[in-house]
Amino acid sequence: MKLGLCLPPFHPPAPVDMALAGANALGVDSLWTFDHLLGIFHPELYPDIGLSEIVPDPDGLFDPFCLAAWAGRSTEAPLGVAVTDGLRRAAPDVARSALSLQHLCRGGFNLGVGSGEAENLLPFGYSFDRPVSRTEEFLAVLRHLLDSGRMPDGPGRLGLPLESDAGRPRVWVAAHRPRMLRLTGRYADGWLPVDVTSPDQYRRLKTTVAGHAAATGRAEPESGLFVFLVLGDSRDRVREMFEAQPMAKLFALWMAPESAWNRYGIENPAGRSERAFIDIIPHELDAARLRDFAPSIPFELIEEYTFLGNPAEVAERLAAFAAAGLEHPVILNLTGMAGGLDEAMARGTEMEELGRAVRAMTTTTVPATAHA
């Protein structure tokens, strides 16, 4: 199985340098970063989260395309953005950026696209209306530009070569629900979900994507998974880390949908949403209420959306996804979120161990189901 790592796109650059050096030592198959204008933690509470020892401002986020260009000269691995959206970026601009980075990065470029998140749109004056319909329009133009160098209509064209020595830029789509899964099969070279909590769910969604690809005469997209990772000596040690840093538990506020909170009989102070991170804007919530609420968040709920424990424990869980068809996990190491600088620095060898285990895994082929 391939291994991708996500570079933290936070100021200052030193942690990014460290992550890049570690990734090169691991010999990863891909490097990515994410495209956020706001971070996921309330700024008033952030000083009480371990990550603040490493990153001083949760909203101090570099532009991902600039970061990819900077990092792409220091590694043979392809760089990627996981993910941007077509609600605040126009397809011709993104296509030009993707082609530019395909040539500027030694290993080429992976372009991840999603349907947008409220926190990156509404506070900055962007519309969040019709996100999936607008994403479909975006992908249609983007695909045409990357395949032909021209707009679907009119004289608009991009003069950059469509290929580098590393090939063509590859489009990945973050999809979880029927319409976006259809768009993945129709337009994407890769599928990169984040909100998948079980191998059975992963297998079902992968089969759907493959069916849509087959129905449009395209090859099945490569199957990825964006993985949030917290390493420790054991699962029990990670539990202790979160109990000692309860504000870090607010990560679940961003990831878990209403149905997950309902299973634990807890009312989510962020409101009722089955789409969780798509709808939630943490900065708009009452900080005092969140501070009181955080200690009550069950560790088991965090575990549903985070791969945590020692390398053997994490590898066992990832192996179940490999058996469901996972080909290319993209791992964001969030150990510092709960453990702070000491835990983050102490887990270098464990990350290497996990990387070796992932690379040794074999992906199980999952047959496609045709879709009209």
Report each predicted region and the residues it spans.
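Glycine-rich, proline-tolerant flexible connector loops at the mouths of alpha/beta enzymes
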Residues: 32-62, 85, 117, 122, ...
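N-terminal beta1-alpha1-beta2 module of alpha/beta enzyme domains
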Residues: 1-74, 169, 368-372
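An alpha-helical appendage that flanks or caps ligand/catalytic pockets
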Residues: 128-162, 202-320, 362-372
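Hydrophobic faces of well-ordered beta-strands that scaffold small-molecule active sites
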Residues: 3-7, 31-33, 79-82, 109-113, ...
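Short, acidic/polar
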Residues: 12-23, 94-97, 174-183, 311-320
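Alpha-helix-loop-beta-strand connector modules within alpha/beta enzyme cores
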Residues: 49-80, 141, 347-364
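Active-site mouth loops of central-metabolism enzymes
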Residues: 3-14, 82-92, 166-176, 229-232, ...
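Conserved, mostly hydrophobic/aromatic
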Residues: 27, 35, 71, 101, ...
